[in-house]
Amino acid sequence: MTTSNNRIEKLLIEGGGFPAFWYSFGYGKQMLRQITPKFIAGYSAGSLVAVLLLLPDCNTHGIMELFYNTVRCCNLCALEPLIRSTMGECLPTNIHEIANGKLGIILCAANNDRQCKMVINWDSKEELIDCLVASCYIPFLMDGCRTDDKQYRCRDAIFSRNLYEFTKEFDYIIKKEHQNNGIIHFIENIIPVPPGEAVDLVYHGELASAYDCNNVDDTSNSFI
């Protein structure tokens, strides 16, 4: 491996809906077998992956079983109940203590000219889950009428004016490339992928991570 553990300070996991969640989860789990970032941040689906990577015992089988038991109870637009139920079950009661200072959740501050903001401290598990919901908040889709979440008054960072500039502050970025753009890409992101496809995405993420961690260019800030 060409990269030493102490060289990685800040890791960012980008969003991209359900496909990116499974891919990035596989990528991140494999990466942490070789490299230990001091700080992990994420936005949208990437924020969910980021918090799960703080839990060494979190495994693909357990997350998939919980996710697919929950997703059957939710319709296409009920993303918030899915996030709250899944994260409520898999995150420990003291997750806020584990995460404080080690995890960053990136939001789009709708009331501040759509600038990115990053939250790094929480007082409870419930508050952290509220923040995860805000990071995944898509106007009019989450609850049908609001343009931002109720607790943080924010939305998915993909709607931020300065997301690209904000991500430059990170040493490495995990992202899933996509073939389509526009409305097709949006639809692909919000529809849960079948379990078999999720397994494939996790596997491909693991393979990509194993390759990148051994062939990374020292001048690059992306694992893709």
Language model features with spans:
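Patatin-like phospholipase
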Residues: 1-43, 51-224
